[in-house]
UniProtKB/Swiss-Prot annotation:
InterPro entries associated with the record: NA-bd_OB-fold, Ribosomal_uS12, Ribosomal_uS12_bac
Protein name, UniProt field: Small ribosomal subunit protein uS12m
GO CC annotations on file: mitochondrion; ribosome; small ribosomal subunit
GO molecular function: structural constituent of ribosome
Family label: Belongs to the universal ribosomal protein uS12 family.
Encoding gene (name): mrps12
Pfam families found in the cross-reference section: Ribosom_S12_S23 (PF00164)
Species this chain originates from: Dictyostelium discoideum
GO aspect biological process, one term: translation
Transmembrane spans: none
UniProt entry keywords in alphabetical sequence: Mitochondrion, Ribonucleoprotein, Ribosomal protein
Cellular location(s): Mitochondrion
Amino acid sequence: MITINQITDRKARGPKKKRKTLLTGYPQKKGYCMRVYETKPKKPNSAIRKVAKVTIKLKNKRKNLIAYIPGFGPHNLQPLSTVLVKGGRCQDLPGVKYRLVRKHYDFLAAERFVRKNRRSKFSVKNLETKAKKGKAVRIE
């Protein structure tokens, strides 16, 4: 049962506001790397994760965010590299709520190994199409 004091207290505080992310209204956004560095994850995990501090332009303001650099192996990111940022946090890195998209702008580093069973996200064509019964195969 709710008391009178709780009712009056709730009115004084008002409703909770929803937090907006920096990418609200945009699926991805172009940005520039300001700093590329490595950090360690939270307690039970141990690794060296690669992250970048990225500046994006929103209307007339510039905002900074920290984005995770996905994938294995080396990357070619440097300060002032142009990158594409998408949403999606890294669960064991506090404050990292965004990811970088590979194969766009200056972030061209491919992974060391070849993925055989999975097509890439973000409109990368399938180069190895299997021939169907009696039909010609077009490789782009």
